[in-house]
From Swiss-Prot:
Protein name per its UniProtKB record: ATP synthase subunit beta, chloroplastic
Protein's organism: Phaeodactylum tricornutum (strain CCAP 1055/1)
PROSITE patterns per UniProt: ATPASE_ALPHA_BETA (PS00152)
Phylogenetic classification of the source organism: Eukaryota, Sar, Stramenopiles, Ochrophyta, Bacillariophyta
Domain of life of the organism encoding this protein: Eukaryota
PANTHER family (UniProt xref): ATP SYNTHASE, ATP SYNTHASE SUBUNIT BETA, MITOCHONDRIAL
């Protein structure tokens, strides 16, 4: 038998997803090491070291269910943190937290792996000049532009179009920036993960015939997984994204759905690890854990990772420590509105609630800034007049206010746009609208150059030329 120098220990205690493992004197694995445990039925469980307890024991968190584990089972120190496959072979596939494919499409032939725990880029590697990341979506680029290498919070309830917006962004970054996307499903519903996968195949974001031509890699750790998996799956997705940025020198979109579940999983494990809970029962290390994840998402001189994170707000309380800690890291927010979705205005991005730190003179052009402010002003005035219209009717408004309402309704409709991934639903071909065309279009509407066009001409079109052409067909 070949002699191996693997460091072995045995399980001494199991408390739910947390277990203690004893090693021989002087052979303690460092924190974040991966340890493999093989059960009687030959199934493997990977656990990650969280604490060194003294007496040659470590406390670890399991990435799989601990059902069937018993004390005395052998544990093998793998000598490294959890390593996951990276690079082009990951495209079009679904992985779990430890980098195993879970889509029943056969094994993944990969050349490289990377550890999920890595340092954030050094200051000298960072791209310091803020630049806008053009998405081709009018409402986003004009009113709440994304920062290249920034972090965006995506807020919205069920059924207002989060998934379709995410898929359109994946599609547009591939076409316009030659970039790829990584989707991290953190602690959300398995059904939603499956629906997203099926929709991506339908819309061509995932190419089943040739996975290498797909535009996205998927990493899932859903609600039914133990907290260890949900706590680490975000890091697995981030590691795959970092490879595309640092080695392939691409612009990468990283989606995390949902960032709150990352915090929630950490709080589930925290008490079992014997840590004193802090405010509202969250882990005392909440800000540190969030910072370790978020600081790795950034622009370097090689490429960028722009992250879009769905944010669940527990009980709609924005002061809850979990969302409050997340907000500190965000550069922009995209808020989806049920009211707009009910009107059929898609994408249902709320133009008054969505914000961005990029919308300031010096980063965007003066023309862009002035147009965006003018659009918001017009929509805000329309919002204020709606009560009067509802009670007295539009005829009771002054001439000036009636003109404002007419333009605001055109602006509202012009903020809608046909998506490439929604062609099946809308029957209209998708449109990518450049920032230049977007600004030009809204300027023309606000300056009154198109007051004689019917408002229906502005609904679900790309640039302003299409609206003018559509008006001709409506005559």
């Amino acid at each position: 038998m070949v002699k191996t120098n693997l460091n072995k220990g045995y399980v001494t205690q199991i408390i739910g997803p947390v277990l203690d493992i004893k090693f021989s004197e002087g052979n303690l694995p460092p924190i974040y090491s991966a340890i493999k445990i093989i059960l009687d039925d030959n199934t493997e469980t990977i656990v990650e070291v969280q604490q060194l307890l003294g007496d040659n024991k470590v406390r670890a968190v399991s990435m799989r269910s601990t059902d069937g584990l018993k004390r005395g089972v052998e544990a093998i120190d793998l000598g490294t943190p959890i390593n996951v496959p990276v690079g082009t072979p990951t495209l079009g596939r679904i992985f779990n937290v430890i980098g195993e494919p879970v889509d029943e499409q056969g094994e993944v032939k990969y050349d490289e792996t990377l550890p999920i725990h890595r340092d954030a880029p050094a200051f000298t590697e960072l791209e310091t000049k803020p630049s806008i990341f053009e998405t081709g979506i009018k409402v986003v680029d004009l009113l709440a532009p994304y920062r290249r290498g920034g972090k965006i919070g995506l807020f919205g309830g069920a059924g207002v179009g989060k998934t379709v917006l995410i898929m359109e962004l994946i599609n547009n970054i591939a076409k316009a920036h030659g970039g790829v996307s990584v989707f991290g499903g953190v602690g959300e519903r398995t059904r939603e993960g499956n629906d997203l996968y099926e929709e991506m195949k339908e819309s061509g974001v995932i190419n089943e015939k040739n996975f290498a031509e797909s535009k996205v890699a998927l990493v899932y750790g859903q609600m039914n997984e133990p907290p260890g998996a949900r706590m680490r799956v975000g890091l697995t997705a981030l590691t795959m994204a970092e490879y595309f940025r640092d080695v392939n020198k691409q612009d990468v979109l990283l989606f995390i759905d949902n960032i709150f579940r990352f915090t929630q999983a950490g709080s589930e494990v925290s008490a079992l690890l014997g840590r004193m809970p802090s405010a509202v029962g969250y882990q005392p290390t909440l800000a540190t854990e969030m910072g370790a994840l978020q600081e790795r998402i950034t622009s370097t001189t090689q490429g960028s990772i722009t992250s879009i994170q769905a944010v669940y707000v527990p009980a709609d309380d924005l002061t809850d420590p979990a969302p409050a800690t997340t907000f500190a890291h965000l550069d922009a927010t995209t808020v989806l509105s049920r009211g707009l979705a009910a009107k059929g205005i898609y994408p249902a991005v709320d133009p008054l609630d969505s914000t961005s730190t990029m919308l300031q003179v010096g980063i965007v052009t003066e023309e862009h800034y002035a147009t965006a402010e003018n659009v918001k002003e017009t929509l805000q005035r329309y919002k204020e007049l709606q009560d009067i219209i509802a009670i007295l009717g539009i005829d009771e408004l002054s001439e000036e206010d009636r003109l404002t309402v007419a333009r605001a309704r055109k602006v509202e409709r012009f903020l809608s746009q046909p998506f490439f991934v929604a062609e099946i639903f809308t029957g209209s071909p998708g449109e990518y609208v450049s920032l230049e065309d977007t600004i030009k279009g809204f300027l023309m509407v606000l300056n009154g150059e198109l007051d004689d066009l019917p408002e229906q001409a502005f609904y679900l079109v790309g640039n302003i030329d299409q609206a003018i052409a559509k008006a001709e067909t409506l005559k």
